[in-house]
From Swiss-Prot:
The keyword Translocase does not apply. It is found in: Cytoplasm. This is Thiazole synthase. 1-deoxy-D-xylulose 5-phosphate binds at G156, A182, G183, N204, T205. GO terms for cellular component: cytoplasm. InterPro entries: Aldolase_TIM, Thiazole_synthase_ThiG, ThiG. It is an enzyme of class 2 (transferase). The active site is at K95 (schiff-base intermediate with dxp). Keywords: Cytoplasm, Schiff base, Thiamine biosynthesis, Transferase. It comes from the Bacteria. Homotetramer. Forms heterodimers with either ThiH or ThiS. One of its GO terms (biological process) is thiamine diphosphate biosynthetic process. Its EC number is 2.8.1.10.
Length: 271
């Protein structure tokens, strides 16, 4: 079981709610994914009613909501969005996102760290979306973040684990959950992240924008399970050289000698 902030999750696949063609399709895809933690952009919530057209169905499914601060350009805006989320949705869980650049949506490390520090002090369970920066992730852990969410590649790019080598370092040194987020465009990318030792992945665009989101959600669920099993089993090490899986000549020598067809000396000469 995956544990984040003392809460256990049976599924290591987290999903988003954006880009689906309809609310019904979104609900069906989330159900097919088996996800128990679903992120929701605060900018989509109607603060007059405290809801949007998808909030009630999500709550009825029993999933935990992870409101995010997507659209915030600095720490001040992110903190304001977090406080609204706590008041309107009744949750202290938060995916912290601060990306002032609308073209590449790269997370701002300085503003993210400042906001995370303040929000943790207010009792929030902060899951910050960040660059795959091992130093930053370590600092975020030190100030009390519940998990870190380093990117695989830019949001919605479907490029996969471009930051692979840095993710390995983050995973190796972290003592809090590492959730690979952004850029995961295929089930094979999710499987690879889990094989590296990530605790979970968050996927939205690859599911929502596929021709069959429900089937794609199932595919991602299977990929995450397979990747986790492979990691737990222990992957073989890589090598530049070939390594035989069975003796190359010894069995022939033994076989020729024991059958009596030739003596051992002749067997050596034949081989």
């Amino acid at each position: 079981m995956l544990k984040i902030a003392e809460t256990e999750f049976g599924s290591r696949l987290f999903t988003g709610t954006g880009k689906f063609a309809s609310g019904k399709l979104m609900q069906e895809a989330i159900a097919a994914s088996g996800s128990e933690l679903v992120t929701l952009a605060m900018k989509r919530v109607d603060f007059k009613t405290g809801s949007d057209d998808i909030l009630a169905p999500l709550l009825s499914r029993g999933v935990r909501l992870l409101p995010n601060t997507s659209g915030a350009r600095n720490a001040k805006e992110a903190i304001f969005a977090a406080e609204l989320a706590r008041e309107m949705l009744g949750t202290e869980w938060l995916k912290l996102e601060i990306h002032p650049d609308p073209k590449y949506l790269m997370p701002d490390p300085m503003e993210t760290f400042a906001a995370a520090k303040e929000l943790v002090s207010q009792g929030f369970k902060v899951l910050p979306y960040v660059h795959a920066d091992p130093v930053l992730c370590r600092r975020l852990e030190e100030i009390g973040c519940a998990a870190v969410m380093p990117l695989g590649s830019p949001i919605g790019s479907n490029q996969g684990l471009v930051s692979r080598e840095f993710l390995k370092i983050i995973i190796e040194q972290a003592s809090i959950p590492v959730v690979v987020d952004a850029g995961i465009g295929a089930p094979s990318h999710a499987c690879e992240a889990m094989e590296l030792g990530a605790d979970a992945v968050l996927v939205n665009t690859a599911i929502a924008s596929s021709a069959d989101p429900v089937r794609m959600a199932r595919a991602f669920a299977l990929a995450v399970q397979i990747g986790r099993e492979a990691y737990l089993a222990g992957l073989g090490s890589k090598s530049l050289h070939a390594h035989e899986t069975s003796p190359l000549t010894g069995f022939l020598n033994t076989g020729l000698s024991t059958t009596g067809l030739v003596d051992s000396g002749m067997a050596e000469k034949l081989l």
